[in-house]
């Protein structure tokens, strides 16, 4: 599939903006997937190519967080393994199952996340008592989060962030950093199988990845500099926008 320089420039810009937002609050796919579909790209190709550029953004942000020692990989390794395995299963199943039921319930879930962050102003203000062990988190939640990202994906960054805050007791900055590494892991797993299935347009994906690398790095720097005062309102705003977008796509506002 050949695209003109103007279209590639538009996709580069879309990836840059999406990755910046995604590094802070998640939801970048709301920008990049519609942008890819606007080019006339088949949906499967759009999803696979989006995973490539999203992987670049997640990698850029994760490297920044790791350099700042915001993530402890040795403690999180089993969680990342279960996320990887869950994402592999989800990616394989989405190629053979209908995701309609999940799509119908998703606006309610994303809205609930936004409302939770909005109505709990002290959420993630500081580290709190850990409610479950890393092992239990990995087995019960890591695998599910990975599965969801591989199977469908929208809002997974916000879900990972919320899980780290409420279950592991992380503050919002720490939770956002760990959520990005979790997202990197699930993206990598999905990308492998989209590649095997021939659903990645590399020229487009690499152009977008370049924009994503830059945007995600800037977003990660903002997270470390501004912390909760930036993350919380961004999560709320992105959650509400995602809810409206998904509800519109399902025809809720068509009269």
Give, region by region, the residue ranges found by the protein language model.
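Selective hydrophobic functional segments
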Residues: 48-101, 187-234
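Transmembrane helix-loop junction
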Residues: 38-39, 91, 95, 104, ...
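Alpha-helical transmembrane segments of integral membrane proteins
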Residues: 5-9, 48, 101-108, 136, ...
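Hydrophobic alpha-helical transmembrane segments in multi-pass integral membrane proteins
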Residues: 144-154, 190-198, 242-255
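Selected transmembrane alpha-helices and immediately adjacent juxtamembrane segments
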Residues: 1-42, 127-176, 206
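Hydrophobic residues within alpha-helical transmembrane segments
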Residues: 13, 17, 52-55, 59, ...
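Transmembrane helix exit motif
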Residues: 60-70, 107-132, 241-255
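Membrane-interface alpha-helices at helix entry/exit sites of multi-pass transporters
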Residues: 41-50, 73-78, 169-180
């Amino acid at each position: 599939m050949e695209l003109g320089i103007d279209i590639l420039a538009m996709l580069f810009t879309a990836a840059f903006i999406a990755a910046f937002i995604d590094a802070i609050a998640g939801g970048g796919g709301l920008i990049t997937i519609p942008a890819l579909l606007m080019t006339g790209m088949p949906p499967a190709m759009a999803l696979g190519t989006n995973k490539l550029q999203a992987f670049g953004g997640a990698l850029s942000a994760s490297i920044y967080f790791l350099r700042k020692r915001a993530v402890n990989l040795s403690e999180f390794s089993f969680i990342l393994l279960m996320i990887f395995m869950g994402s592999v299963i989800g990616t394989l199943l989405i190629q053979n199952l209908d995701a309609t039921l999940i799509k119908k319930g998703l606006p309610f879930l994303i809205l609930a996340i936004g409302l939770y962050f909005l109505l709990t102003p002290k959420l993630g203000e500081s580290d709190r008592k850990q409610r479950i062990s890393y092992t239990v988190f990995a087995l019960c939640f890591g695998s599910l989060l990975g599965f969801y990202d591989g199977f469908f994906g929208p809002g997974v960054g916000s879900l990972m962030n919320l899980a780290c805050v409420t279950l592991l007791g992380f503050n919002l900055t720490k939770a956002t950093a760990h959520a990005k590494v979790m997202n990197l892991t699930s993206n990598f797993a999905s990308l492998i199988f989209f590649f095997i299935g021939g659903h990645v347009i590399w020229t487009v994906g690499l152009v977008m990845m370049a924009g994503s690398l830059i945007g995600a790095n800037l977003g990660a720097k903002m997270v470390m500099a501004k912390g909760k005062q930036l993350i919380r309102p961004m999560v709320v705003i992105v959650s509400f926008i995602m809810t409206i977008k998904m509800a519109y796509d399902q025809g809720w506002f068509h009269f």
